[in-house]
């Protein structure tokens, strides 16, 4: 049987919020079977818990934000991407502020934290959402689509008319049965343009942003001294973001996601469209691990 997974131990980290610039204390804790991923604002009294579910997404400007009443948790997508990539079904995420720390702008530090805490299998079958037929959403020239696929695959295309992007790969497709999330996707950092940063800061966004936690691009070059981690780091980060956004379904996916210029808003719209279309998906478990799509047969850390 493919079993649900949680963390073996509690683990803590400290960082800053990308948009708030505030110091944030993060604690990842094991959670019981069928809990899902739950964000907990421990700076509030009483503590407010917000499950990482598509219906709890309230804002999608620059990041994915979970909302419950007037309480928010910003920038959840990179941590959720790491949880998805390592197959963590159940965990509590305690935060001392309204934003998940940005760390280095990728999912790499979260992967390291989760691997350091250890993975613990639980005595219950892991539930997967299997895509049964195509579901798509569009907005202008942006598009996001789910199609049936026996495994988990994410394809993405960006389209920036900019000197830094023109000579680079702007399309990537990752089949996780043959590609390691940890090695090929998790270290791709978020990126931003110098020309946008002043405006963002005037809107109280990107206050914690720097070359320490993002790829910063000016009119014709990458400003980070060390350059890029992957030749296609820009589009790989969009894949990383999409994996985090898709994990708001609450379960691992069996299917393919295709995005063209999609962002957090369209990704969430696709999830809501899928959830509402009950004939387009089903929940499945695997009593015999040998019958499962290969990408889920062992911890991603070992791939």
From Swiss-Prot:
EC number: 3.5.1.108
One cellular component term from this protein's GO annotations in UniProt: membrane
Entry keyword Nucleotide-binding: no
Disulphide bond pairs: none
Pathway: Glycolipid biosynthesis; lipid IV(A) biosynthesis; lipid IV(A) from (3R)-3-hydroxytetradecanoyl-[acyl-carrier-protein] and UDP-N-acetyl-alpha-D-glucosamine: step 2/6
InterPro entries, per database record: Ribosomal_Su5_D2-typ_SF, UDP-acyl_GlcNac_deAcase, UDP-acyl_GlcNac_deAcase_C, UDP-acyl_N-AcGlcN_deAcase_N
Entry annotated with the keyword Nucleotide-binding: no
Record keywords: Hydrolase, Lipid A biosynthesis, Lipid biosynthesis, Lipid metabolism, Metal-binding, Zinc
GO annotation terms (biological process): lipid A biosynthetic process
Cofactors required: Zn(2+)
Binding of Zn(2+), residues: 78, 237, 241
Top-level taxon of the source organism: Bacteria
Signal peptide: none
GO molecular function, one term: UDP-3-O-acyl-N-acetylglucosamine deacetylase activity
Enzyme active site: 264
Catalytic activity: a UDP-3-O-[(3R)-3-hydroxyacyl]-N-acetyl-alpha-D-glucosamine + H2O = a UDP-3-O-[(3R)-3-hydroxyacyl]-alpha-D-glucosamine + acetate
Similarity-based family: Belongs to the LpxC family.
Record's function text: Catalyzes the hydrolysis of UDP-3-O-myristoyl-N-acetylglucosamine to form UDP-3-O-myristoylglucosamine and acetate, the committed step in lipid A biosynthesis.
Protein name (Swiss-Prot/TrEMBL): UDP-3-O-acyl-N-acetylglucosamine deacetylase
GN (gene name): lpxC
